[in-house]
Amino acid sequence: MPTVNYLRISLIDRCNFRCQYCMPDEAELTWLQAPERLTDEEILTLVREVFLPLGIDCFRLTGGEPLLRPGLEHLIRALCSLPGVRDVALTTNGFNLSQKAQLLYEAGLRRINISFDSLNPETFRLITGRDRWRQVWAGIQVAHQVGFDPLKLNVVVIPGLNESEVEDLAALTLERQWHVRFIEFMPIGNAALFQQAGWVESEVLRQRIRARFGLEPGFVAGNGPADVFRIPGAKGTLGFISQMSECFCDRCNRMRLSSDGWLRPCLLNESGQINLRDPLRAGIPAERLRQQVRELLDIKPDINFKGRDTGSQGSYRRTMSQIGG
């Protein structure tokens, strides 16, 4: 097992989209109220006193939609300034990015992932539940102009919706130094659609792209599990995240912290979670919290390998937006 050095921090469970694979309109969700969410100071305390001493020094801010969190740029500035923090990145749906990209960059953020599931505005509306393609595309352009590098676009491939666009989405990397990542559809968030539509193996997508453009090994900076390739001569790269077809538990280097303070060692397994918010608010010393997290790190390999649920059975109590993706 690799060293766990990467934490995904969900800042908010709310979102201004209703993506079919995450938070569909028909989902019955109860939003967290502000007092239930970790405050900026609580997040910084956990990072400074619990995670950094354990060697976890790379952080990704997620949601929900993190750009909905008030004062996000102040949290980013404080997080980036903590001694020992090696990397801070953010994942967003891009809707508010045109207005906020410059502020985020000035706060110290350099790496950003944007969900972008279709080049077709109507298909985009069907997937996200909102008619906001143009605003997101504009946000991508602004983020590129501001200087985010690498700029990554996340594509969840859903049969019958955007599967036919894979080659066109891959072509975005030909003249742009972008990283387009194709993510296998998972059952978390919308099990009914997963059962109905299924998912497409990354290898099938690679074969299609290889047939049209060719494909060679590539590299992009980051901390994720993507297998990286490049179209020969392209400025950008392609990534494939194959959590359904190609188990990468043996190279998992991450944990997830929900916006209400639950630390989760594995995306596909709900066992082993620990609550950090309540003991932190109760004044429990940081050393005791570190020990809890240390013990969770010790058992993470067993949770990854022995408790992994591929979605073929069981159910998930939390949606992707509540977990933090």
Curated annotation (Swiss-Prot):
The EC number of this protein is 4.1.99.22
GO molecular function annotation: 4 iron, 4 sulfur cluster binding; cyclic pyranopterin monophosphate synthase activity; GTP 3',8'-cyclase activity; GTP binding; metal ion binding; S-adenosyl-L-methionine binding
Which keywords belong to this entry? 4Fe-4S, GTP-binding, Iron, Iron-sulfur, Lyase, Metal-binding, Molybdenum cofactor biosynthesis, Nucleotide-binding, S-adenosyl-L-methionine
Report the SMART domains cross-referenced here.
Answer: Elp3
Q: Would you say which domain of life the source belongs to?
A: Bacteria
Q: Give the UniProt family note.
A: Belongs to the radical SAM superfamily. MoaA family.
- What's the protein here called? GTP 3',8-cyclase
Species whose genome carries this gene: Synechococcus sp. (strain JA-2-3B'a(2-13))
